[in-house]
Regions:
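Extracytoplasmic/peripheral linker and loop segments enriched in polar/acidic and small residues
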Residues: 1, 7, 19-20, 98-107, ...
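Periplasmic binding protein-like
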Residues: 70, 91-137
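Sec/Tat-exported extracytoplasmic proteins
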Residues: 1-5, 17, 39-46, 90, ...
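Extracytoplasmic/secreted proteins, especially bacterial periplasmic and envelope-associated proteins
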Residues: 30, 34-37, 78-92, 106, ...
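Append "and occasionally in soluble cytosolic enzymes with long acidic Gly/Pro-rich linkers
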Residues: 1-88, 167
Length: 194
């Protein structure tokens, strides 16, 4: 990934960190079998046989396509490229997603207004992998109404309990709040004698 400067991740923690629970990550790792099981449990299927997934909405009395827009900041070619690949892959599975690539200022405006269905973002976490900014009321990363007192409590417990993150990561994955893609690695290159 990214020319060797990133590692794929299932949990919101650097995979080489002692905080990364490989067993839990395996439970939530990529699996088409689990994907189709989740669709079935949510009653999502191609009901009108048009190649697109639909969700029956009882209050409406009919099915609606599973569609939406993924927002990405256009200032990074790599981010746009990654978001494009994600949208293409999800559409190949039957979703009806479009990608909206906008400049940084508009990206922030749309995030703050909650005017998106999905967004591809890049976040630099603190060394202790604190996720509080995503879940605390008024948090700097609480976009799309992610404020959740239970998640905030689990974040606090993880910080107090020396990185015991199992319950936090399990709830995060069960709820689908965040989907980690990768963690960047940084390197400093020097020449001998410098």
């Amino acid at each position: 990934l990214m020319g060797g400067f990133a590692a794929a991740a299932t949990l919101p923690c650097q995979p080489n960190s002692k905080l990364y629970d490989a067993k839990l990550a395996l439970k939530y790792s990529y699996s088409m079998e689990n994907f189709y099981r989740q669709l079935e449990s949510a009653s999502v299927e191609d009901m009108d046989h048009d190649g697109r997934l639909d969700l029956y909405v009882p209050s409406l009395g009919y099915a609606v396509p599973v569609s939406g827009t993924m927002l990405v900041c256009a200032s990074s070619y790599q981010r746009v490229q990654a978001a494009t690949k994600i949208v293409q892959d999800l559409n190949a599975l039957g979703f009806d997603l479009t990608l909206k690539s906008v400049d940084y200022e508009e990206y922030l405006t749309l995030l703050r207004a909650g005017n998106f269905d999905l967004y591809y973002g890049e976040v630099r976490l603190s060394p202790n992998f604190d996720l509080s900014p995503f879940f605390q009321s008024g948090g700097s990363l609480t976009y799309g109404s992610l404020a959740d007192s239970t998640m905030q409590s689990l974040c606090n417990r993880m910080l107090v309990n020396s990185g015991n993150s199992y319950n936090l990561y399990q709830r995060l994955c069960d709820r689908g709040y965040l989907t980690p893609v990768m963690f960047k690695n940084y390197a400093v290159y020097t020449t001998r004698g410098s």
